[in-house]
Amino acid sequence: MSGLTHFDESGRAHMVDVSEKPVTARVAVARGAVKMSAETLALVTEGRAEKGDVLGVARLAGIMGAKRTADLIPLCHPLPITKVALELTADPALPGVVVEATVKTGGQTGVEMEALTAVSVACLTIYDMVKAVEKGMEITGIRLLLKEGGKSGRFEASA
């Protein structure tokens, strides 16, 4: 299974040994969105959702999700995360909320999964907090936008 680092020579899943890799500065940025009706978006942006501050709670949930990534994704290394920041932006053209997460560490492996988990958990939290008024919302477009640091260098997603 050449190229797939989470499998050994026999094809069995294993956690990659990063003990010999140098500690370097690493950053990852991910993005996703929750599409909803304009009416539901107004509830969110005007602070009228029954469960409270949707965007504030989703931001905290995303931060918590990034910190718990190694508990959720079986082969992820627990990392000393040094920064998690989430931007949640209402987009009337979508309509919906765009979520972008930036995660940083000084470590031996990257924080791509932490950034993707932060976005996913924030989007799920938005859905949870307003599902009572709209069950047909769509979580969409979750992807890695940027990865820097480590042996493989810089990755930037195409537009």
Swiss-Prot record:
GO BP annotations listed: Mo-molybdopterin cofactor biosynthetic process
Binding locations of substrate: 75-77, 113-114
Phylogenetic lineage: Bacteria, Pseudomonadati, Pseudomonadota, Alphaproteobacteria, Rhodobacterales
Calcium in keyword set: no
Similarity remark: Belongs to the MoaC family.
Protein function: Catalyzes the conversion of (8S)-3',8-cyclo-7,8-dihydroguanosine 5'-triphosphate to cyclic pyranopterin monophosphate (cPMP).
Active site feature: 128
Record EC number: 4.6.1.17
Protein name: Cyclic pyranopterin monophosphate synthase
Enzymatic reactions: (8S)-3',8-cyclo-7,8-dihydroguanosine 5'-triphosphate = cyclic pyranopterin phosphate + diphosphate
Pathway stated in the Swiss-Prot or TrEMBL entry: Cofactor biosynthesis; molybdopterin biosynthesis
Keywords assigned by UniProt, alphabetized: Lyase, Molybdenum cofactor biosynthesis
Gene Ontology terms, MF aspect: cyclic pyranopterin monophosphate synthase activity
Keyword presence, Lyase: yes
Assembly and oligomerization: Homohexamer; trimer of dimers.
